[in-house]
Amino acid sequence: MSKHNWTLETQLVHNPFKTDGGTGAVSVPIQHASTFHQSSFEEFGAYDYSRSGTPTRTALEETIAALEGGTRGFAFSSGMAAISTAFLLLSQGDHVLVTEDVYGGTFRMVTEVLTRFGIEHTFVDMTDRNEVARSIKPNTKVIYMETPSNPTLGITDIKAVVQLAKENGCLTFLDNTFMTPALQRPLDLGVDIVLHSATKFLSGHSDVLSGLAAVKDEELGKQLYKLQNAFGAVLGVQDCWLVLRGLKTLQVRLEKASQTAQRLAEFFQKHPAVKRVYYPGLADHPGAETHKSQSTGAGAVLSFELESKEAVKKLVENVSLPVFAVSLGAVESILSYPATMSHAAMPKEEREKRGITDGLLRLSVGVEHADDLEHDFEQALKEIAPVSVR
């Protein structure tokens, strides 16, 4: 088998930077230099100042480009730095369509920052192709997708939205944080820019803040690099190295966590104290078939709704294994409360319209044994009086 046909899990370990050419070290060197000596007065080398690029950052950027099937990758200081830099492609008077139940940080960026610069926005149900089509305006320049969405796991038909975008001269951005290239490759489906909070599954250990982007079109890549260099929200070399290390185990971590997530979703679905479960791996999820057509797995994030905020509080106080925290995608399971965590920036009325109620919890499943997690939730849910009988 040629290296071009290697499976993803092999590519993750055996990337082009797996050994250092000068020393043979089985690790990417961390180049802490902020500036680089130029041996020629007339012709500079590949690196001059670390904001513009470093060998360590190049290793990460080329790796994410290859994993996503792109021509160019970009490493940023956070997921929101990646998203914000991509939005710099917009100009005053432009309009952007955004998934209605988008991540709270993106919601804040769109509603509180882009509006100050005269950039219009419309939140739409991206699962409804007709609504997307009706919402496109003459000045719409970007359609921004999350699929699955955060935190209600809505599924967008990527190809359908890409087709609408191309018919109307729009760029498409897609936040691929939940899926990663291990489960979904948006560039192959026609998306222009794929974005990641690499803080999450890509690094996978709750120990680094980082963002990544990848593009297939080389001209768009040049434009995005110019903005990355100008805006300057780039990833430091130590953090680049941590993400590169985390990537090596992405496939095994995600496979394990996804299997457990499926089991827990089915467990929650049957439990009388749980009103609703959001997970695309469930047969009755409205986007299940669409998701299967464009991805290779349901992922390791699910959300479930309890009767009230009081029920949520009781569960959180009685569960033992998951950490109660913001973020997701780590080796440890993370239980989050979107109303006061990921979507705290969203007004309550807007949250509730999107199904992000005071009873909603999001669970990022880690690599713990499935039996232990299920037993932990089972004992915690016993503290909550059943609200329905299935």
UniProtKB/Swiss-Prot annotation:
Disruption phenotype: Cells lacking this gene grow as well as the wild-type in the presence of sulfate, cysteine, homocysteine or methionine as sole sulfur source, but do not grow in the presence of cystathionine. The modification N6-(pyridoxal phosphate)lysine is found at residue 200. Keywords: Amino-acid biosynthesis, Cytoplasm, Lyase, Methionine biosynthesis, Pyridoxal phosphate. It comes from the Bacteria. GO terms for cellular component: cytoplasm. It catalyses: L,L-cystathionine + H2O = L-homocysteine + pyruvate + NH4(+); an S-substituted L-cysteine + H2O = a thiol + pyruvate + NH4(+). Induction: Up-regulated at the transcriptional level when sulfate, cysteine, cystathionine or homocysteine are the sulfur sources. Repressed by methionine. CDD domains: CGS_like (cd00614). Its cofactor is pyridoxal 5'-phosphate. It is found in: Cytoplasm. GO terms for biological process: methionine biosynthetic process; transsulfuration. Its EC number is 4.4.1.13. InterPro entries: Cys/Met-Metab_PyrdxlP-dep_enz, Cys_met_metab_PP, PyrdxlP-dep_Trfase, PyrdxlP-dep_Trfase_major, PyrdxlP-dep_Trfase_small. It is an enzyme of class 4 (lyase). Pathway: Amino-acid biosynthesis; L-methionine biosynthesis via de novo pathway; L-homocysteine from L-cystathionine: step 1/1. Disulfide bonds: none annotated. Catalyzes the transformation of cystathionine into homocysteine. Also exhibits cysteine desulfhydrase activity in vitro, producing sulfide from cysteine. Belongs to the trans-sulfuration enzymes family. This is Cystathionine beta-lyase MetC. It comes from Bacillus subtilis (strain 168).
